């Protein structure tokens, strides 16, 4: 049971060191063709689309960085640390004008429009004038030594090895002192977070295609490259003009994770119970985040949107107590901390201490939310409103014991994903309906 003391220990973990993947011996190399799924979300082929995208001079015709590394895995029975040391050395030998090697320079990128901004950086739609390629440029605000920024660039180069219809394509990265600029595939239809907030809850049929894309994408990242995403949430799942669904912003760079100041606040709302309690991050933590995301998209609101105050403020919410009872199992939980009337009044006056939850104007302090995730039953879809296999899928994702929770690869074999993968859903029409 978390207590106020536990809250103090949680805050001490905000240096994010624990978010880095442990460098343990890696499994034998996995053939990318064995893990890349045969079915693709949408009528068009993501692979054929990728072939039309302008490639940089540092990328081979097959789309991979010209390095003697197969599928991002060490081909010798050495440790993960040895693999990363070798890769870093190989990338260091490329000459440190990474932007020149990738033919990406700030002066060659013409800004077309602003796509978004936050504490961590900005995203703009740009035109690479030399190739005529439209890209999304993400500028990450980093307060770090030049040597750390260069190390981040080296770590990001493994993204050139990621080749999947479920992963947003990466064109390259360069320094624009003091920040890091990353250029990626432009996804015309926004993130799932922006889509459901504008158009309302997403249908079970589309949610099925989302489950297919994310489970296969996470499987590819981990099985082929030993990458754990670490930040699965609707705002990191994007849709392009053909209705294809792809994941982005995965944790390939440990230095980048450590350098972004708001990482803890940004990811904690989707964090698994074991991660909140300080355990090592694993690929099963991504599965928990996927389960929370599917509920959020299907209901059109964040599933943990529970008020920290008493019921007299319920009239201000955009959902009812009956709605809450359907998503918080088994019923609307009692407050985690018993508060006296004076304390309730004090909390009302100190409202800015709370955070606005995804998909809701509702506020709950980060500590209260973390206590809720650890101590209360996990959220669930309202019984009877969604397909049975969808309910079962979400319940498996949200098993609180990580030993019982499936891996992304296990999810790809679940009947919900198999059925959704085979279902004829016009994703192009879905995308066309979003103006």
UniProtKB/Swiss-Prot annotation:
CDD domains per record: PKc_Byr1_like
Chain residues that bind ATP: 115-123, 138
Domain of life of the native organism: Eukaryota
Keyword Transferase appears in the UniProt entry: yes
Active site residues according to the UniProt entry: 231
Alphabetic keyword roster: ATP-binding, Kinase, Nucleotide-binding, Phosphoprotein, Serine/threonine-protein kinase, Transferase, Tyrosine-protein kinase
Enzyme class: transferase
Biased composition range(s): Polar residues: 46-59
Coiled coil: none
Keyword Protease: no
Region entry Disordered, spans: 1-61, 307-359
UniProt-recorded Gene Ontology molecular function terms: ATP binding; MAP kinase kinase activity; protein serine kinase activity; protein serine/threonine kinase activity; protein tyrosine kinase activity
EC number annotated for this UniProt entry: 2.7.12.2
Role this protein plays: Protein kinase that is necessary for a-locus-dependent processes, such as conjugation tube formation, filament formation, and maintenance of filamentous growth, and for a-locus-independent processes, such as tumor induction and teliospore germination.
Name of this protein: Dual specificity protein kinase FUZ7
């Amino acid at each position: 049971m978390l207590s106020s003391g536990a809250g103090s220990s949680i805050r001490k973990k905000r240096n994010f060191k624990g978010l880095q993947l442990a460098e343990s011996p890696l499994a034998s190399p996995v053939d990318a063709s064995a893990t890349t799924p045969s079915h693709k979300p949408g009528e068009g082929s993501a692979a054929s689309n990728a072939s039309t995208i302008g490639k940089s001079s540092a990328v081979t015709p097959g789309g991979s960085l010209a390095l003697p590394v197969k599928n991002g895995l060490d081909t010798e029975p050495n440790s993960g640390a040895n693999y990363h040391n070798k890769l870093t050395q190989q990338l260091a030998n490329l000459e440190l004008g990474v932007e020149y090697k990738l033919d990406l320079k700030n002066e060659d990128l013409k800004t077309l429009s602003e796509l978004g901004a936050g504490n961590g950086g900005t995203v703009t739609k740009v035109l690479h004038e030399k190739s005529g390629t439209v890209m999304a440029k993400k500028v990450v605000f980093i307060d770090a030594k030049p040597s750390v920024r260069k190390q981040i660039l080296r770590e990001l180069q493994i993204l050139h090895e990621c080749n999947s219809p479920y992963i947003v394509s990466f064109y390259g990265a360069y320094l624009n002192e003091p920040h890091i600029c990353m250029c990626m595939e432009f996804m015309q239809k926004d993130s799932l977070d922006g889509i459901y907030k504008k158009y309302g809850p997403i249908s079970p049929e589309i949610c099925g295609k989302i489950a297919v894309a994310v489970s296969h994408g996470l499987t590819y990242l981990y099985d082929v490259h030993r990458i754990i995403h670490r930040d699965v949430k609707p705002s990191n799942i994007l849709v392009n003009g053909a209705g294809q669904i792809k994941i982005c912003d995965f944790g390939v760079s440990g230095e980048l994770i450590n350098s972004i100041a708001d990482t803890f606040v940004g990811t904690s709302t989707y964090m698994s119970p074991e991660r909140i309690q300080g355990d090592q991050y694993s690929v099963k933590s991504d599965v928990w985040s996927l389960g929370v995301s599917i509920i959020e998209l299907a209901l059109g609101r964040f599933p943990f949107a529970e008020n920290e105050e008493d019921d007299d403020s319920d009239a201000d919410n955009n959902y009812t107590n009956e709605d809450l009872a359907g998503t918080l199992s088994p019923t609307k939980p009692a407050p985690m901390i018993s508060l006296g009337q004076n304390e309730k009044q004090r909390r009302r006056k100190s409202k800015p201490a709370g955070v606005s939850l995804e998909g809701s104007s509702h506020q709950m302090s980060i500590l209260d939310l973390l206590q809720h995730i650890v101590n209360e039953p996990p959220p669930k879809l309202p019984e009877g409103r969604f397909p049975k296999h969808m309910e079962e899928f979400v319940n498996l994702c949200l098993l609180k014991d990580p030993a019982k929770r499936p891996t992304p690869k296990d999810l790809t074999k679940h009947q919900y994903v198999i059925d959704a993968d085979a279902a004829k859903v016009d994703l192009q029409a879905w995308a066309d309906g979003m103006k």
